[in-house]
Amino acid sequence: AALRNWGALTVANTMTLHSGATLYNKGTITSKNISINSNTKIVNDNKISLEGELNLPSNFSLENNGEIYGEKLIANSDAVATNNNIMKFTTISLTNTTVNNACSMEATTSFYANGATFNFTQGYLKAPKMEFVNGTVNLSDGSMLDATTSISIPPGYAKFYGKGENT
């Protein structure tokens, strides 16, 4: 099933997307949380504002071409998130996830990644505290990690690669 929002959609509590659903958003969505089952897809071309969390389960796909704001971004195994504009959360926690970031991704309190693969193409990640456990980070032309307080990368666990003019 597909849900298409081209206007303003406000959900008082939790918006739930069931398995196999696709959400296309070209309007504005405001909700407490978005609860998602596996095998689901969100394509956001405008704005999603959450008071709580966006939890991306396994076999999930997110394509953000607009803006997404919330308290928590949690992504689990086999989730793929592609960010082409702005994603801003208080905390971001990613486990065995693939993230393709071409623009702005920010965690205002903390960022944690375990077993995740990041592909940055001129995008940046900003957080006061960052922790990378396992996983791979690929930084391309003009990409940047901005850890304003601390960054933790246990030796031998995370792999960082850079390419382009400023590596």
Question: Residue ranges of each PLM-predicted region?
Answer:
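Extracellular beta-strand-rich, repetitive "passenger/adhesive" scaffolds
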Residues: 1-167
